[in-house]
């Protein structure tokens, strides 16, 4: 499903924007905005639901406890009263459905930006090498990888599959050649004959596991050396993987630290992601009663995620998408938190805000201890 959405929805939109402005960086920005605008009603529903639940949750929990205590011996009446509470305030799970609906599209967008033309496309083949006397009893089962759209020109791409006709089980001393071809069986080498400078799309071959078990040549021929497990990986270079955008040196560049150098463009993108995530969380609590636990989580979460992405191998193009998406999310959150609440929730919110301000006001009016709640009793 992810691949279908990517090939039939997202890549055509990407082609359209690249045709308007020949910049893959701008195409990523435009694609991100279009998808986020299209998903606005769904994400807005989730934000509204989360905002309302944050206000109503203390009241819901209090009423649920009272109902369970009052009707402890009458489960039918208990369920009936609990249902009334859910009907009045809504289900806490109501905000999850819009998120689930939009997840396939967001995953497809993420997968699109991790593939061609923005990054090198890997094909992974897991092999099992058996002794010669055992391989004869194995029935060959053809292997076909997942299809990936490979851009061979700015707006021209073909679906490419890696296959082994006799499967991934080899006998010691056997050889097999990995075929790269389109869905209709046309060889990838044949496709490249119509491309300028076809050598830039030449796949690179490597052994990521079991380099003592198999050997692989530059044409994709695998030779089994000894019994064991091995993994061979082919990578087809991405057309735009080395293209830059603004301060980004290469959209396909991966990693904050590589080859002994710091990639400052990646560092800036990761920092921008953390900052926009923090801003979005800060805006989600705007106009709400103070919640120390939530405030702490809002500070720690962006730092943890930002630190993780510094060392998580994401291409610069994906990080650019994440920053733009976070900016859109922050703007959307700001607009939605300014919406009027239902009357019953507004009353609850007013009471919560009053309860927080009354103790401080009363203490100050009485001329007593004017310390703030978090200050030690020993004085300032």
From Swiss-Prot:
One of its GO terms (molecular function) is membrane insertase activity. It is a multi-pass membrane protein. The chain crosses the membrane at residues 9-29, 93-113, 266-286, 304-324. It is found in: Cell inner membrane. GO terms for biological process: protein insertion into membrane; protein transport. Disulfide bonds: none annotated. Its main location: membrane. Keywords: Cell inner membrane, Cell membrane, Chaperone, Membrane, Protein transport, Transmembrane, Transmembrane helix, Transport. GO terms for cellular component: plasma membrane. InterPro entries: YidC/ALB3/OXA1/COX18 (IPR001708), YidC/Oxa/ALB_C (IPR028055), YidC_ALB_C (IPR047196). Belongs to the OXA1/ALB3/YidC family. Type 1 subfamily. Required for the insertion and/or proper folding and/or complex formation of integral membrane proteins into the membrane. Involved in integration of membrane proteins that insert both dependently and independently of the Sec translocase complex, as well as at least some lipoproteins. Aids folding of multispanning membrane proteins. Probably also aids protein insertion, folding and/or assembly of membrane complexes destined for the thylakoid. NCBIfam families: PRK02654.1, yidC_oxa1_cterm. Interacts with the Sec translocase complex via SecD. Specifically interacts with transmembrane segments of nascent integral membrane proteins during membrane integration. This is Membrane protein insertase YidC. It comes from Parasynechococcus marenigrum (strain WH8102).
């Amino acid at each position: 499903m992810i691949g279908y959405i990517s090939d039939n929805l997202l890549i055509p939109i990407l082609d359209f924007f690249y045709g308007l402005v020949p910049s893959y960086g701008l195409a990523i920005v435009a694609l991100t905005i279009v998808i986020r605008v299209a998903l606005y009603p769904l994400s807005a529903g989730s934000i509204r639901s989360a905002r309302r639940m944050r206000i109503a949750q203390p009241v819901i929990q209090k009423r649920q406890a009272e109902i369970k205590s009052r009707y402890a011996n009458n489960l039918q009446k208990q369920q009936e009263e609990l249902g009334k509470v859910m009907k009045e305030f809504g289900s806490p799970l109501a905000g999850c459905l819009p998120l689930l609906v939009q997840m396939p599209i967001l995953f497809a967008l993420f997968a699109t930006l991790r593939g061609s033309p923005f990054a090198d496309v890997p094909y992974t083949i897991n092999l099992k090498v058996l002794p010669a006397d055992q391989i004869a009893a194995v029935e060959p089962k053809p292997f076909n990888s997942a299809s990936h759209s490979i851009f061979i020109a700015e707006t021209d791409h073909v679906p490419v599959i890696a296959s082994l006709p006799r499967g991934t089980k080899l006998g010691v001393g056997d050889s097999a050649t990995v075929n790269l071809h389109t869905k209709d069986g046309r060889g990838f080498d044949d496709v490249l004959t119509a491309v300028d400078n076809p050598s830039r799309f030449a796949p690179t071959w490597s052994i990521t596991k079991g380099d003592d078990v198999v050997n692989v040549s530059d044409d994709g021929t695998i030779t089994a050396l000894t019994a064991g497990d091995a993994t061979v990986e082919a990578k087809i270079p991405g057309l735009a993987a080395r293209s830059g955008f603004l301060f980004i040196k290469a959209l396909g560049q991966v990693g904050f630290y590589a080859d002994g150098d710091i990639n400052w463009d990646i560092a800036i993108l990761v920092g921008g992601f953390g900052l926009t995530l923090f801003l979005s969380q800060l805006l989600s609590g705007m106009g709400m009663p103070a919640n120390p636990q939530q405030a702490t989580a809002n500070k720690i979460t962006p730092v943890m995620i930002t630190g993780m992405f510094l060392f998580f191998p994401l291409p610069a193009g994906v990080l650019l998408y994440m920053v733009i998406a976070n900016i859109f999310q922050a703007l959307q959150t700001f607009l939605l938190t300014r919406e009027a609440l239902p009357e019953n929730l507004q009353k609850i919110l007013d009471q919560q805000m009053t309860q927080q301000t009354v103790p401080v006001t009363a203490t100050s009016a009485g001329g007593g201890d004017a310390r703030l709640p978090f200050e030690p009793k020993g004085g300032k």
